[in-house]
Swiss-Prot record:
Start-end of Basic and acidic residues biased regions: 77-86
InterPro entries per UniProt: Mitochondrial_sb/sol_carrier, Mt_carrier_dom_sf
Homology family: Belongs to the mitochondrial carrier (TC 2.A.29) family.
Gene name of this polypeptide: ugo1
PROSITE patterns to which the protein is assigned, alphabetical: SOLCAR (PS50920)
Role description: Required for mitochondrial fusion as well as normal mitochondrial morphology. May coordinate fusion of inner and outer membranes during mitochondrial fusion.
Protein name, UniProt field: Mitochondrial fusion and transport protein ugo1
Gene Ontology biological-process entries: mitochondrial fusion
Length: 421
């Protein structure tokens, strides 16, 4: 004890210093290259098999959308099966003119056109064919070839059976490789553009977080629409080549010639139509006539399907039942918009003139702009039973796709819940 500081108690125990352990951070497991390649291979195989199994339905739907289904009356007029025109009844033929007098002969001779004009008229009639609707058509399109298929009206099953009968299995899987490349490149390019643009604007990626759940939904929706449009415009040559390959007959072979060359050049070497030849003949950019239908087909249905749930949530709130009903209605609206726009786009791609053979397995319908093509489908071609069936050709394929997608999502969600449990 210290006499000067009796209040201090001496502790003989040596002081111990508490050592706080350093925090340990959990290190993330390193992903090896083999695992990355294995994941990429599984993704590629899944996408290729999906495209391979769906391709016959897509081929039949494309053929059904592009084919020109004319009413029976118009077909009879095109085939030239009508014997008399209404204005021909008043003009007597040669047998009737025998019993006429000289004055009547002079009257008929005065009103008759000279023989030279008749010859010129016949030459023009041979060069120009005008259908009942007033459009100038190519006479070669009216001639039925051996490779032309004859299917029932708006029947996917009939088109598949005709393709199988005339072209075999190759006819049903035409363009599956280029379809796989287009789908793969489109998904990859759209995801990269979306991630880059959303990172530059400091918002969540619309492919990861839905625009409805985003902090700035309108900006997220704009990014999703603009990236889809840019990706579709960049890959437009692949999409045009896909449509051309599907419509080109496999049973016949043709050569690549310019539009000015005729079919009489039989001494040239024949070549089958391939993907490489299509890409060489097509431009590397989207043609100006296809910009508007491509942008509308890619951007308009997703934009409307994203705006409707956002509007309902702002005005009516959110509940499981309401969200399910809104989701079902949104899918229906997207389907109603997508089918006519897809048909317009396919016809625009089929009518695009390039350095490719003109042969097609079906007569291709007209493309006169988005509104004009829809008007032609409703007024000039066969509209179907309900008047608008012509706008929704191949709708069963779309319904099957939507049903399979919903079923896969339901099964995957149930499996995820079982694994978490």
């Amino acid at each position: 004890m210290n006499p000067y500081r009796p209040y201090v108690v001496v502790n003989n125990v040596e002081p111990t210093f508490s050592i706080t352990p350093e925090p340990t951070f959990e290190t993330q497991p390193t992903i090896s290259k083999s695992e990355i390649f294995e994941t990429l291979r599984s993704i590629l195989v899944t996408k290729y098999l999906t495209t391979f199994f769906v391709q016959p339905l897509e081929v039949a739907k494309t053929v059904c959308q592009v084919e020109e289904y004319l009413p029976k009356r118009t077909k009879i007029e095109r085939d030239g099966k009508q014997t008399k025109e209404p204005y021909d009844e008043d003009i007597p033929d040669g047998t009737e003119q025998e019993g006429l007098s000289d004055d009547e002969h002079e009257i008929y001779a005065y009103f008759e056109t000279p023989t030279t004009e008749k010859a010129v008229t016949e030459q023009l009639a041979e060069k120009l064919c005008v259908d009942a609707s007033g459009y100038v058509t190519d006479p070669s399109n009216l001639i039925e070839r051996s490779y032309t298929i004859h299917s029932k009206r708006f029947s996917i099953k009939s088109i598949i059976s005709e393709l199988w009968e005339k072209e075999g299995a190759r006819g049903l899987w035409k363009g599956h490789t280029i379809s796989f490349l287009h789908n793969l490149l489109y998904s990859g390019l759209q995801s990269w553009l979306s991630a880059t643009l959303s990172g530059a604007l400091a918002i969540a990626d619309p492919n990861i977080i839905s625009p409805i759940d985003s902090v700035r939904p309108l900006l997220s929706l704009f990014i999703k629409s603009i990236t889809s449009a840019i990706s579709a415009l960049i890959l437009s040559p692949l999409d045009i080549a896909r449509t051309k390959i599907i419509l080109f007959p496999i049973s016949s072979s043709s050569y690549l010639s310019s539009a000015s060359e005729t079919s009489g050049n039989s001494h040239k070497k024949f070549k089958p139509l391939t993907i490489r030849q299509c890409l060489k003949a097509l431009p590397f950019y989207c043609p100006s006539s296809l910009i508007l239908p491509t942008v509308c087909y890619v951007s308009l249905p997703p934009f409307v399907s994203s705006v409707l749930p956002l509007t309902f949530r702002n005005f009516l709130g959110s509940s499981p039942t309401l969200d399910a009903m809104v989701g079902l209605g949104t899918s229906a609206v997207q389907f109603l918009l997508k089918c006519p726009l897809e048909m317009v786009l396919r016809r625009a791609q089929a009518q695009y003139e390039c350095n490719l053979p003109p042969q097609t397995i079906v007569p291709v319908g007209k493309y006169t702009g988005i509104v004009g093509t829809i008007w032609c489908l409703l007024s000039e071609e066969d509209p179907g039973k309900f008047g608008i069936e012509g706008l929704y050709r191949g709708w069963r394929v779309g319904i099957w796709g939507m049903s399979s997608t919903l079923a896969l999502n339901y099964i995957s969600s149930n499996l995820r819940e079982e694994v978490e449990f």
